[in-house]
Design a protein with these regions (language model features):
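Conserved NAD(P)+-binding/catalytic subdomain of aldehyde/semialdehyde dehydrogenases
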Residues: 1-77
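Short active-site oxyanion
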Residues: 12-15, 76-78, 115-117, 136-139
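Hydrophobic side chains in well-ordered alpha-helices
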Residues: 27, 62, 91, 130, ...
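Short hydrophobic/aromatic-enriched beta-strand-loop microsegments
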Residues: 37-42, 99-103, 138, 156-157
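A conserved active-site cap/scaffold subdomain adjacent to cofactor or substrate pockets
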Residues: 42-114, 118
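C-terminal core of ALDH-fold dehydrogenases
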Residues: 124, 133-157
Length: 157
């Protein structure tokens, strides 16, 4: 609202664009209907996160990233791709443990049950290929050797 109206330090903008939650969409609708500024006409769907992970990152950190996104809405996708089969079960256990203490666990649990997935890929090339075919809004590379995944162009946004 401040960007649409302007403040003492920020001049009012002509247009607000980009994705956001249902509350952002509502705010954009209000500023448009009030004639304060323009907005793009795109309607955005649910968000998603894709974690590219390996054993150099704690399964608790990976699980936390997936849970943090999923607690926003029951229709959020939380995806992890790894080439470490042992890590898959560790992440699953960590998700289960962390959900027990989460205040909004009902929403996160529903989201993860419906749209949460951990995918095994045989190598880095396959990981990038799967990630690019999904084209998620958010990508996290959770690896000490993150540069090997950034040499190409990960599709995200």
């Amino acid at each position: 609202m401040a960007l649409a109206s302007g403040t003492k330090k920020v001049k009012a903008v002509n247009k607000i664009v980009g994705a956001g939650s249902k509350w952002v969409a509502l705010a954009k609708k209000i500023v448009f209907l009030e004639g304060l500024c323009g907005v793009e006409s795109a309607n955005y769907g649910p968000s998603e996160i894709l974690c590219i992970a390996d054993s150099s990152t704690s399964p608790d950190i990976i699980a936390s990233s997936m849970i943090a996104q999923s607690e926003h809405s029951p229709d959020v996708m939380s995806i992890c791709i790894t080439k470490d089969r042992k890590l898959i079960n560790k992440i699953r256990r960590s998700i289960k443990d962390q959900l027990q203490d989460l205040p909004r666990n009902r929403i996160a649990r529903k989201s993860l049950n419906n749209y949460g997935i951990i995918i095994y890929a045989k190598d880095d090339k396959k990981i990038i290929s799967i990630s690019d075919s999904i084209g998620p809004e958010h990508v996290e590379v959770l690896s000490k050797n993150y540069k090997r995944y950034l040499s190409g162009n990960l599709v995200a946004g």
